[in-house]
Structures are given as structure tokens and as C-alpha cells.
Regions:
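Catalytic centers of hydrolytic enzymes
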Residues: 1-237
Length: 237
């Protein structure tokens, strides 16, 4: 489903929300479809299931699983990330992005790199307009951070997403920005497991139940399929 349908995914959403849950003061958490290796079936979800869903890679510590990293992007770059998803991921389905904190609407009928018609942040269900020059705290896994940093090269300089530190300086080595707890890397799969454990036990069996919130989607990524000429040319970006 992640590759066949270009739309919001509750699987991608729960993983993105897991990253945001695991780290303090996050504006946006990003998960591309290419890093998600398995889904969750109805019934008990084990730690093994969680690990299998995000089992790619190895950290600087030599332990299996990509760690989370802490970076910053400008508001303009966040909008560009949404546009990369809207315009490029139909050709490169592994680049489909699922995010926590970033919402956007796109029209697949518009010109390439001009498909996003609305893009904004959310916090506690409140809409927050994106300021192009402001730095925003972005959490993702190490592999995704490396891929974001390669957008400039892959697009021959047409697009640029440059991960930065909190002072706005370009990051030279993303491994220096791995999130650690007590000296240990915080793995992406561990962040997901923690989030799963944080849910309420709604049936009294002593095991947390996945929130019903994830039984549906919530307009984090909205597809506007209008072919009206006005809708196709308004709000050029």
C-alpha cells in the first residue's frame, strides 16, 4: 500500500509520531516509505514485530538498526520536502514521506515541483503557518537524513535540502548528531516500541492497545484531484 497509493498512511503516521514522541521539542518527524520494512497485523504486536518493521541499517555503535538523528531545516526546506513527496515519489516510490507535525495538500494534476497548494505545521491540532527563514527541529533516522542531504546532488542543484545544526550551520557528519540516551544510540525501532507501550490498556489484559486514532487518517497528506484550470495554476510556488 505504501508504494501503490500516494496518500496518507496510518502505518507511516504511527512511525512518524513515534519519532516525535521519543524526542523532546520536535517540530517535525519524517519517515520515508523506503525505510519501512513490514506492517503490523491485527492482534498482539511484539518487540520483534516492531524491529522487523524498521530493521534497516546499523548505527555508528555497530548495533543493528538505524539510530534517530536531530537536525534542523528552514521553513522553505520543509515546504520543499513536501514538494519532493508530491512531485517525485510517483517515480521513486521509496521517497514517499510520512510526517508528524507537517501537513500538506497537493494536486497531482499540477506541474511537477508545483503540486503542493497548502503546507503548514500542526501542534496539538492547531495550525501553524510555516516561516520560510525560520529553523525547525526535525527528527528522522540516520539513513533518511543522509538521503535528504543528497537531494541537491540527485537533482543536479535544482533542489536543496541541507540538514543543519541548531545554529543554522550545515552539518558535515550526521553521525555527530545521533540522538543518545545515557551514551547509547536511540534506535528508530526502539522509539516505535516505546510509543506502542505508551498507549492505554483499553481491554484490561495488561497490554497496551494501539490507539483507535490510527484506525483512520487525519488529513496530514491531502490529495486534491481537481482539474479545474484555476486550481491548476493558482498559488505557484
Amino acid at each position: 500500500e505504501l508504494y501503490s497509493k500516494h496518500e496518507e498512511s496510518n502505518l507511516g503516521q504511527i512511525i512518524a509520531d513515534s519519532f516525535a514522541y521519543a524526542v523532546d521539542s520536535v517540530d517535525v518527524a519524517v519517515v520515508p516509505s523506503g525505510t519501512i520494512r513490514d506492517t503490523y497485523t491485527k492482534g498482539d504486536i511484539t518487540v520483534e514485530d516492531v524491529y522487523n518493521s524498521f530493521s534497516l541499517g546499523i548505527g555508528k555503535d555497530g548495533v543493528a538498526g538505524y539510530p534517530l538523528i536531530s537536525t534542523y531545516l528552514t521553513g522553505k526546506e520543509l515546504k520543499l520536502a513536501a514538494e519532493v513527496d508530491a512531485s517525485v515519489s510517483d517515480f521513486m516510490t521509496t521517497a514517499r514521506l510520512y510526517s508528524s507535525g507537517l501537513n500538506f495538500t497537493y494536486n497531482p494534476n499540477r506541474m511537477i515541483l508545483n503540486k503542493v497548494t497548502d503546507c503548514y505545521l500542526t501542534k496539538e491540532d492547531e495550525r501553524i503557518e510555516i516561516q520560510d527563514d525560520q529553523l525547525y527541529h526535525v527528527v528522522t533516522d540516520l539513513y533518511t537524513g543522509q538521503m535528504l542531504g543528497s537531494v541537491n546532488k540527485l537533482s543536479y542543484g535544482l533542489l536543496s535540502l541541507e540538514p543543519k545544526d541548531k545554529n543554522g550551520n550545515p552539518i558535515e557528519n550526521l553521525e555527530d548528531h545521533i540522538i543518545k540516551e545515557d551514551g547509547k544510540e536511540l534506535k528508530a525501532w526502539d522509539a516505535i516500541a516505546r510509543y506502542m507501550r505508551s498507549f492505554d490498556d483499553t481491554d484490561g489484559d495488561g497490554i497496551a492497545n494501539v490507539s483507535k486514532y490510527y484506525a483512520s487518517t487525519h488529513e496530514h497528506k491531502v490529495v486534491d484531484d481537481s482539474k479545474n484550470i484555476i486550481d491548476l495554476i493558482k498559488k505557484p510556488n
